[in-house]
Design a protein with these regions (language model features):
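Surface-exposed interaction regions that form or flank ligand-binding interfaces
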Residues: 1-68, 75-80, 91, 106-194
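Surface-exposed beta-strand edges and their flanking turn/coil or helix-capping segments
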Residues: 73, 95-98
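Short glycine/proline- and charge-enriched loop/turn segments
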Residues: 97-106
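Short, well-ordered alpha-helical microsegments
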Residues: 67-70, 85
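Active-site ExK catalytic segment of metal-dependent nucleases
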Residues: 82-90, 97
Length: 194
């Protein structure tokens, strides 16, 4: 009986470290994948950050308390501007107000109108900031990155070409009630959501 127990102990002693090493490597790989997905790719507005007007700060992604996320938020003297991207033209189509996107199985499925979604996200962010700030209202602008010649704007949302983002932000009027201290406070509130 003792040789069998000794052989079993030796087998465990030889295989357990290798098994734990394999499990550890698999967990590290999973964590790296989750971190890469959470970080995401560089967004168009983030790539233009150096060209933005003075005083503008880009927050690449924020998570609203209701679980929704907004990909690009720019805070500056104008208040807050959010940017969302249109789906690729080759994989999307519009029929009136209805938008559809083609999936890898070549079927077309309806999606939410990106312009209306951006306008609603801006309104959600505005309500969140209003709940946090009692003494002033922060102006929140919504824009969708795309070709203004092919997609018309809707109420509450503009269509801006990616190369025109710095000029569009520079054209927004400064919000008079947004003092440097208030602007810093809004930046802190949004950084907490990042």
């Amino acid at each position: 009986m003792a040789p069998v127990i000794g052989a079993a102990a030796l087998a465990v002693a030889l295989t357990a470290p290798a098994a734990f090493a394999i499990v550890g490597i698999a967990r590290l790989g999973g964590a790296a994948t989750r971190a890469r997905v959470a970080r995401g790719s560089t967004t168009p507005v983030t790539r233009k950050a150096a060209q933005l007007p003075e005083g503008c700060t880009v927050i690449p992604r924020i998570w609203l308390p209701d679980g929704r996320w907004i990909p690009d938020v720019v805070v500056g003297p104008h208040g807050v501007a959010i940017f969302e991207s249109l789906p690729p033209a080759a994989a999307s189509r519009r029929t009136g107000d209805r938008w559809e996107v083609r999936f890898s199985d070549q079927t077309w499925r309806p999606i939410e109108n990106p312009l209306q979604k951006a306008a609603r996200d801006a309104d959600r962010l505005r309500r969140h900031l209003d709940a946090q700030e009692r003494d002033f209202v922060v102006r929140v602008q919504a824009a969708v990155l795309g070709d203004p010649g092919t997609v018309g704007r809707v109420d509450g949302c503009s269509v801006v070409a990616p190369d025109d983002v710095p000029a569009w932000l520079a054209a927004l009027p400064a919000q008079r009630g947004l003092s440097p201290d208030r602007l810093a406070h809004v930046r802190e509130l949004l950084a907490d959501l990042a």
